[in-house]
């Protein structure tokens, strides 16, 4: 007789202290990059590091461009505005970025295509006047 075990994976959410520690390290990595890889003036940068978006939530005004920047050494990530019906970005390798300009007020969740289910790599952009 054999018994089969069922395993279900749920996203793992980092606690606030862990997220802060990860995001502090992400910021140090970002500052070490050549300036050509930084967000452009007027853009908001969201860093991708250790399966975390840093910061995980941002609030911007309509017309603001958010630029996601991979500051990992080896891992690729993507940005997927799935609930908005947008296609997933291509995989972003270290020092690569992708951007999106938000024009309408609202709350816009996004995720990393390869890492949202197992690693809980999700974030939210809130657009408010």
Which stretches of residues belong to each language-model region?
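Bacterial N-terminal signal peptides
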Residues: 1-7
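Extracytoplasmic copper-binding redox domains, predominantly the cupredoxin/blue-copper superfamily
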Residues: 10-129
């Amino acid at each position: 007789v054999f018994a089969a075990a069922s395993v279900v994976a749920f996203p793992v959410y980092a606690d606030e202290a862990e997220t802060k520690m990860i995001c502090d390290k992400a910021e140090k990595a970002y500052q070490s990059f050549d300036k050509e890889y930084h967000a452009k003036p007027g853009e908001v940068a969201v860093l991708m590091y250790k399966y975390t978006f840093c910061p995980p939530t941002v609030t911007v005004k309509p017309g603001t461009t958010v630029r996601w920047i991979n500051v990992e050494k080896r891992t690729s990530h993507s940005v997927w505005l799935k609930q908005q019906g947008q296609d997933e970005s291509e995989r972003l390798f270290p020092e690569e970025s992708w951007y999106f300009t938000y024009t309408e007020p609202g709350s816009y969740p996004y995720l990393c295509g390869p890492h949202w289910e197992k690693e809980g790599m999700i974030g939210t952009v809130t657009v408010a006047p």
